[in-house]
Amino acid sequence: MKPSLESDEEEELGALQKTLRERANRSIQHLSSMLAGHSSDSETSEPNQQELLSSVQQNPCSPVQQSEAVSQLRSLLQMKTKDANIQSLSPSRRKLAAKRATDDGSSSQPGVHNLVPIINNQSEYIQHLEAEVKFCKEELLEMKQRVRVVIVENEKLHHELKAKTIEDTLKEYTFVDSTLNMEHTAENTLKERLGSVNQAEDHKWRKEMEQLKCLYQAQTETLEAQVVSLKKDLACIQKEYEESKERLRHKEAMAVAAGTGQRVSGLCLKCAQHEAVLAETHTNVHVQSIERLTKERDELMTVLCSLRASQTDAQQREWGAYQQVKQAVEMAEEANLEKTRALVQCEHFHNELTRQRERLERELASEQDKISQAREAARSESKKEREELMQTLSSLSQKVAELQGLLDRGERDRNSLNSQLEEAYKKLTVQETDSSKMCAELRFLLSQAQLKKEEAERDVRDISSKLGRQLELAEQEVQKLGVELSGYRQRLEEAQRAEGRARAEAAGLAEGLSRAQRQLHLTRQEKEASERCCGEDMAALTFQAQRRERELTQTLQQMEAQHEKSVRETDALLSAQNSLIRKLKEECHTLGAKLEELAQSSRAEMEQLSLEREHLQESAEKLRGRCEEMEEQCVQHGRMHQRMKQRLQQLDQHCQASSQQVLQLLSRQKQLMQERQQLTEDLHSLKSQVHAGKRMDRLAV
C-alpha cells in the first residue's frame, strides 16, 4: 500500500504544480493584456470601482462572510470610497483587526479530541480559502483598473519602456514555466528524487523572490529620489515666487514713493512741464513693468496651482499606493500566519494519526491475543464439559440400566407376592368353608346332644370324676393352644419384622437388593412353614375335634350330667376358635394391607425412579443442547473473530483514506498559499509599475 500511496501523492503534487503554472501563465497574460489595453478616460475607473464594490456586496460567498480578513478588506474599500481622511485612521484599525484575527485563530486552535471534525471541516476551510483568493483577485482587478488609469495618462511618453518591461517579465515567467515543466517531467519519470526536485524548485523560487525584491527596492528608491527631487524643485519654485513677489512689492512701493515725491515738490512751469514729460514716460515704463510683473505673477500662480494640484494628486496616489501595499503586506502576513497554522495543524494531525494508528494496532494485537486466549479457553472448557458430559451420560446410562434391572426385579417380586397372596386368600376361603361345615356339624351334634341330654344327665353323676379329669386334660390342651398361639404371634411378629426389613431394604434398593431378595426368600419359607403349621394345627384340631366328638358320643350316651359342662366347653372352644379365626383373618388382612402398602411403596419408588429417569433424560438432553450451544458459540466466536478482522481492516483502510485526505488538504493548502504568493508578486509588480509611471509623470512635468 505504501508505494501506491506515494505514487498517488506524487501524481497529485504534479497535478497541483500544473494547475499553479497554468494560473501563473493566465495571470501573466491578463497582466500583459491589461497593460497593452487603452482606456478613454480616468473617470471610467471610478464607476467601475463602484460597480465592482456593489457586485461584491450583492454577491457575497458564504465562506467570505465568515472570514475576518475579507470583512476588513471590504470595510477598507468602503472607507476609501466614502472619505479620504478615514484612510489615515485605517492602518491602526487594520492592525487591531489583524491582532484580533490572530488571537481568535490562536484561541480557536483545535485539540486532540477535535481531530476528526477538523478533518471533516477541511473541505469547508479550502472553500473559504478559495473565496479569499477570489476576493483577492477582485481586489487585483480593481488595482489593475487604477493602474490602467495611470498608464493611460502616461501612455504616450512611456510606451516603449512598458513594452520592454512586459517582454522581460514574460521572458522570466516563460523561463520559470519551462523549468517547472522540465522538473514536472523529471518528477513523473523519477519519483524517487521528488524531495531533491522540490528543494531545487524552492531554491529557484527564493532566488526569483530575492530578484523581485531587489527590483522593487530599486524602483522604490528611484521613486523616492524622484519625490525628493520634485520636492526640491517645488521649494526652489516657491522661493523664486516669494522673491519675485517681494521684488514686485518693492517696485510698487518705489513707484508709489516716486509719485508722491513729485506731487509734493514745487517747481517752476518749465521744470514742471519737463518733469511731467519725464514722468509720463517714466510712468509708462513703470506701468509696463507692473503689467509684465503681474503677468509673470499670474503665470507663476497658475504654475504654482498646477504644481500644487499635481503634488496633491501625487500625494494622494502615493497614499493610495501605500495603503494598497500595506493591505497587500497585511494580507501576505495573514496568509503566512494561516500557512504556519495550517502546517502546525497538519503536523499535529499527522502525529495524532500516527499515534491513533499505533494505538489501534496495539489494541488490535491485544484483542487478537485476547480472542486467541478466549478461543483456547473456550475450547478447553468445551472439551472438559464434553468429557464431563460423556462421563455423566455413561454413568447415567449405567444407572438407568441398573434401575431398569431393579425395576424388572421389583415387578417380578411383586408378581410373585401377588400370586402368594392369592394362594393364601384361597386357602383362607377353604378354611372358612371347612370351619362353617364344622360349625354346622357341631350344631347338629348339639341338637342331638340336647335330645340325648336327658339320657346323659343320668350318667353325669357317674362320669363327673371322669369329666374332672377330662377338664384337666382340656385345660392342659387350652394351655398348649395358648402356647401355640403365642408362638404363632411371635412368628407373625418375626414375619412383620422381616417385612419391615424387606421394606427398608426395598427403600434402599441401590444398596442391598440382593439382601432383600434373600430376606424375601426367607420370609417366603417362614410363611410356607407358618402355613404348613397352620394346616397341621387345623388338621390336629379337626382330628382332636373328631376324637372329642367320638368321645362325647360315647360319653353322652353314658353321662347326661356332664352334657352341660361339655356344651360349655364346646362353646368356649367355638368362641376360642372363632376368636382365633378372627385374629387370623385380621392378621391376614393386616398382612394383605402391609403387602398392598409394600406394593404401593414399590410402585411409588418405581414412579420416583421413572421420574428420576425422565429427569436424568431431560438433564442429558439439556446437556446435549448445551453442548450444541457451546459448539454454536465456538462457531460464533470464530465468526466474530473474522468480523473483527474485517472491521480492523476497514479501520486501517479508513485511516489510510483519512491520511490521503489530509495529504490532499495539505497539497490544496500549499497550492492556495502559492497562489497567494503569486498574487502578492503580481501586486508588487503592479505597484512597481505604478511607481515607475509616477516617476515618468514627474519627469514629464
From Swiss-Prot:
One GO BP: neuron migration
Biased composition (Acidic residues): 1-13
Compositional bias annotation for Polar residues: 45-67
Disruption phenotype: Morpholino oligonucleotide-mediated gene knockdown causes multiple developmental defects, including abnormal body axis curvature, shortened and broadened tails, kidney cysts at 72 hours post fertilization and hydrocephalus.
UniProt keyword list: Cell junction, Cell projection, Cilium biogenesis/degradation, Coiled coil, Cytoplasm, Cytoskeleton
Residues forming coiled coils: 119-173, 203-258, 323-695
Disordered as annotated region, ranges: 1-67, 84-114, 364-387
Entry's localization field: Cytoplasm, Cytoskeleton, Microtubule organizing center, Centrosome, Centriole; Cytoplasm, Cytoskeleton, Microtubule organizing center, Centrosome; Cytoplasm, Cytoskeleton, Cilium basal body; Cell junction
InterPro entries attached to this UniProt entry: SDCCAG8
A matching Pfam family: CCCAP
Assigned GO CC terms: anchoring junction; cell projection; centriole; centrosome; cytoplasm
Domain of life: Eukaryota
Function according to Swiss-Prot or TrEMBL: Plays a role in the establishment of cell polarity and epithelial lumen formation. Also plays an essential role in ciliogenesis and subsequent Hedgehog signaling pathway that requires the presence of intact primary cilia for pathway activation. Mechanistically, interacts with and mediates RABEP2 centrosomal localization which is critical for ciliogenesis.
Name of the protein in question: Serologically defined colon cancer antigen 8 homolog
Gene transcribed to yield this protein: Sdccag8
